[in-house]
Amino acid sequence: DEPEREPIGLWGQRHLKYIQKCCKPFFNKMIREHTLYDYLLQIDRDAEEMFSELVKRMAIQEGVSEQLKADNQIEWVGKMNNIRQRATEIINHDIIYN
């Protein structure tokens, strides 16, 4: 029995779809060399780490704090959703669709 592999997360899955469509030779090479799983796992980890750092940094820069969350939860949710969306766009541009 093979040990259970860590599942590829959302970022890795998005990148997989991209390389299947737009980078066929690269995708096929990774399949032949049995390196696709490790590559996608690393993409997923790198993207998740970058996403977390971006969200944290943007929230600090924009004053989206735990105090705001306590004072005005609706405003906090709106601002955090906006920050997450912008961080997602950066990750997509810099890692996923690159």
What residue spans do the PLM features occupy?
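C-terminal charged interaction modules
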Residues: 56-98
